Design a protein with these regions (language model features):
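Flexible assembly/topogenesis modules
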Residues: 1-219
């Protein structure tokens, strides 16, 4: 039987608080050709994460699909262990496009450092192995398992978390509030080749719906 309970609850919420809050994710993108230092700024009520994507400068060139490291090559042989690795499920063919091939622009001695308003995040310069560990911890439910070699050659994406764990599930704005003082970010690397850098600032925004269909967006 149809009721108007939901409408009553909505009206009571608007009457008590003044508006109905509808949180949603918002993303801001920054692109540059990176050699050693790239700068950006973020102004948001809740800056949750920073996603860093490294690609070769010729990533837009059309070419054949690229085999993922460790999986079967053109001759049908796996490139890690005989029979494939059960942990990484490499006993099959797997391909990605050149556009979505994210490659570590450095070597094993390369260090990565993020500064937000002159504060280091984390407090030391990371290697690519440490970046993989940090990225897995920055996502509440990591699903993909990969080797360090696959990470550096095919899926090199770094994620810096600024929000509390499980805040996405509860839709809580627990990230950095950078509205009064805009966050000035600097990404520094050592011993890297020139690459195409794309930054995604993941933020929690809020749509406020008031009486009389009045709306407001809090970035």
């Amino acid at each position: 039987m149809a009721t108007n309970i939901l409408e009553q609850l909505t009206e009571q919420r608007i009457a008590s608080v003044g508006y109905l809050s509808l949180p949603f994710k918002n993303y801001f993108t920054y692109q540059s050709t990176h050699t050693s230092t790239s700068r950006f700024n973020v102004n948001s009520a809740s800056w949750d994460r920073l996603w860093v994507v490294y690609r070769p400068t010729a990533y837009g060139t059309q070419k054949e699909p690229v085999a993922v490291s460790g999986h079967k090559n053109g001759s049908g042989n796996v490139t890690y262990d005989v029979g494939g690795s059960y942990t990484f499920n490499t006993n099959n063919e797997r391909y990605i496009s050149n556009y979505f091939k994210f490659v570590d622009p450095g070597d094993t001695n390369t260090k990565y450092n993020l500064q937000v308003n002159s504060a280091n995040v984390p407090a030391y310069k990371m290697s690519s192995a440490e970046a993989l560990s940090m990225t897995k911890g920055a996502v509440d439910m990591p699903k993909n398992v990969m080797s360090l070699d696959q990470y550096r050659n095919d899926f090199f994406v770094q994620c810096y978390r600024f929000c509390l764990p499980d805040s996405d599930f509860n839709r809580l704005a627990s990230g950095l509030d950078t509205r009064s003082v805009s966050a000035q970010g600097t990404l520094e690397t050592t011993s890297v080749n020139a690459c195409a850098l794309t930054l995604f600032a993941e933020c929690s925004s809020e749509l406020r719906v008031g009486s009389g269909r009045a709306i407001e967006v809090v970035q």
